[in-house]
């Protein structure tokens, strides 16, 4: 009888452990594990990126990246994106809210990536939005992007800090900041962002998830609704939405200039990707542009990413 009771207790324990394997409690908050891609976070209880964004969709979004005319054939791939994104899914990257919000954030982030790495033009096969991930670094840079006045992240002799990556990084101080963020020595080795696609995506996602200054939102925050504008923000016409992601990432290089080609190209990539992913551009969200927004960080104060 005692043996039978012990066996029953063992079976109950195994059953309870199995039920808890995917869901745990941390400080009274439900957290979940989804294997290697997402674990130990409440955001992991939602669908992960690979649940709703598959390799064939990545191929559709970046259909011409490996064409002979492209400048980084064979470099970018789906697995590199998923591997980099997985580092940030526990923080809510494309796991905040439901499936539609996750898909919209994938399209928004990759919309920036596609626009910033495109070699497309209006008459190109498939149109200008079909040529994202054509580059992994700036071609024929006109300068070395070395700011000798920066003592915290001084230029390394013989190293050039031209644009590299999925959302290109410029200038020595920015390579230093991003390198600290992803725990890579980019100040000494900025070339890593044009040699390793996973690191290139990781640097871009880190920028998406990280505020440029204290008490400011990240691009992720303004997109998913984590940010509540202050009175000063509303007076500056800054509101949550895709438009504010451009403000966070580029400031007055893109925003506050009315309707410009640079701004509209980024919006076009975002909406095109929404269509290809089956979400539809009608779900682009409010406050799509930043033409009237005052920059969070004017050029005189910005980090010049």
List PLM regions with ranges.
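Folded extracytoplasmic luminal domains of secretory or organellar precursors
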Residues: 21-305
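Cleavable N-terminal signal peptides of Sec/SRP-targeted secreted and luminal proteins
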Residues: 2-21
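A positional/structural detector of protein chain ends, strongest at the extreme C-terminus
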Residues: 1-3, 304-305
